[in-house]
UniProtKB/Swiss-Prot annotation:
Keywords: Cell cycle, Cell division, GTP-binding, Magnesium, Metal-binding, Nucleotide-binding, Septation
Binding site for GTP: 34-41, 61-65, 79-82, 146-149, 179-181
Annotated Mg(2+) binding sites: S41, T63
Protein's recorded name: Probable GTP-binding protein EngB
PANTHER family xref list: ENGB-TYPE G DOMAIN-CONTAINING PROTEIN (PTHR11649:SF13), MSS1/TRME-RELATED GTP-BINDING PROTEIN (PTHR11649)
UniProt-listed Pfam families: MMR_HSR1
Gene that encodes it: engB
Lineage: Bacteria, Pseudomonadati, Pseudomonadota, Gammaproteobacteria, Enterobacterales
């Protein structure tokens, strides 16, 4: 049975430069990843109905740390460093990418990945790499096509259908939805997916403990 979580109760736990400085690797985490201007912080703020939970910046590439938020005991959302922003110094970019890759490959509690892309510019190389990595380790993916309010209804549907077809060759557990923080479009789909992931995994953990 799918439990409904109170995302408005989500609270900030810690910011860390790398995996070694994070909280204990137990429980369940779902990570939010995307290019530096994809609207990750806005999506997290909209999901939790908290204006300042995740800091939004007019300057893409400011989210340099892995940020952890607790929904309830043992259930966390993770805001990962934005990737692919050209104006960040190369050395800093490499450092972020290393922290990002290390988290994605070594974090045992990571159980789902939300990949955010601007609906007008979806499936850039790094976006596709992120999806491929998730599929390789059998991690379910929710793709959110953000800033959907920037397109008229017909164009929005066309982009949604195009991306849904484009991810089929990945052969993974991938769902694609349009999303707008401004218009609250797709927020219900995001909540449903998170509820489903967290409920399924919490139930599985309880069964393991009972054995």
């Amino acid at each position: 049975m799918t439990q409904q979580y109170n995302y408005h109760m989500t609270r900030f736990i810690i910011s860390a430069p790398d995996i070694r400085h994070l909280a204990t690797d137990s429980g369940i985490e779902v990570a939010f990843a995307g290019r530096s201007n994809a609207g990750k912080s806005s999506a997290l703020n909209t999901l939790t109905n908290q204006k300042n939970l995740a800091r939004t910046s007019k300057t893409p590439g400011r989210t340099q740390l892995i940020n952890l938020f607790e929904v309830t005991d043992g259930v966390r959302l993770v805001d990962l460093p934005g990737y692919g922003y050209a104006e960040v110094p190369e050395q800093m970019k490499i450092k972020w990418q290393r922290a990002l890759g290390e988290y994605l490959q070594k974090r045992n509690s990571l159980k789902g990945l939300v990949v955010l892309m601007d609906i007008r510019h979806p499936l850039k190389d790094l976006d596709q790499q992120m999806i491929q990595w998730a599929v390789d380790v059998e991690l379910p993916v929710l793709v959110l096509l953000t800033k959907a309010d920037k397109l008229a209804s017909g164009a929005r549907k066309a982009q949604l259908n195009m991306v849904r077809e484009a991810v089929l060759p990945f052969m993974g557990d991938i769902q694609v939805e349009a999303f707008s923080s401004l218009k609250k479009l797709g927020v219900d789909k995001l909540r449903q997916k998170l509820d489903n992931w967290f409920s399924t995994l919490e139930h599985a953990e309880e069964e393991q403990e009972a054995e």
